[in-house]
A protein has these predicted regions:
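Active-site hotspot residues in diverse enzymes, especially metal/ion-binding acidic/histidine motifs
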Residues: 1-191
Length: 191
């Protein structure tokens, strides 16, 4: 959702217990498959682990805001469980073993090169390895720059919004919420 109202706390994603099904919301405005795959895997983990019930919402703050993340996740067992399952889904121990020998002070080009080689050899997502390295060593700028070297970006936001538009029947959304849906998705005013 690219157009959330100003003043809302920065978040990467959320999962909502809407009626009889979970709804995953991706709010991060990055176009990297690696970022998006982790966010979706993390939110899906909340569902699989039974953290979400009808009427319950879990909003995950920005992972890149390490000070907020560290203080909140240390006391939030569910976030830790969701992170662990998401990381397992995206690379299990293989990814951790691969990046364990990578130097913490590597620059973006080194991270990208190592990520690409390891990804090919082990059928993993190179961008995920780069971000996992950034998370492990709290070196987000280098990890994000490495994604640029990998050229793994796509118009993920556009693709997700197109899928949402194909699958959301606005006629089933309450009249007073249609304008809000149009605003936060950037679809323009609903007639």
């Amino acid at each position: 959702l690219p157009h959330l109202p100003v003043g809302l706390r920065k978040m990467d994603g959320a999962v909502l217990g809407a009626a009889d099904r979970p709804v995953i919301v991706v709010a991060r405005r990055k176009s990297s498959r690696a970022w998006l795959s982790f966010i979706v895997a993390h939110e899906l983990a909340h569902v699989v682990l039974g953290h979400v019930r009808p009427g319950v919402s879990i909003v995950d703050v920005s992972l890149q805001d390490m000070s907020t993340y560290a203080s909140e996740s240390a006391t939030d067992r569910q976030e830790g469980e969701a992170d662990a399952l998401a990381l397992r889904l995206l690379g299990d121990g293989v990814a951790d073993t691969l990046i364990a020998n990578w130097l913490p002070n590597w620059g973006p080009a080194q991270i990208a090169a190592a990520s690409r080689l390891a990804a090919r050899a082990h059928r993993l997502e190179a961008g995920h390895l780069a971000l996992r390295h950034g998370f492990r060593h709290q070196r987000w700028p280098e990890a994000v720059s490495a994604l640029g070297f990998l050229s793994e970006d796509l118009d993920a936001e556009g693709e997700l919004l197109a899928q949402l538009k194909r699958n959301v029947d606005l006629d089933r959304v309450a009249d007073d919420l249609q304008d809000m849906v149009a605003q936060i998705t950037g679809w323009g005013r609903v007639a």
